[in-house]
């Protein structure tokens, strides 16, 4: 039995705001957002682009990561987290 990967992702909207979510199919979810069928928040801020994502072994882990990420209230706090974690990915 294989476990399905899950993703916590961050989108940058056309108005430069950030949207955070989780999914088990990142490519499909991004397409859904850009088709105007995703979250209400992104529907009116199209197009959106994938800014960052993390891979997890379960949906629950991705949901937890999303909740923790959303505790960062300011854009600068969120971008600092992304910058730090992207550097860590490159160093592995």
UniProtKB/Swiss-Prot annotation:
Q: Which organism is it from?
A: Streptococcus pyogenes serotype M5 (strain Manfredo)
Against CDD domains, the record matches this protein to: GIY-YIG_UPF0213 (cd10456)
An example Pfam family from this entry, by short name, is: GIY-YIG
Question: Per its record, how is this protein called by name?
Answer: UPF0213 protein SpyM50708
Domain GIY-YIG intervals: 4-80
Q: Which domain of life is it from?
A: Bacteria
Coiled-coil parts of chain: none
Q: Which family does it belong to?
A: Belongs to the UPF0213 family.
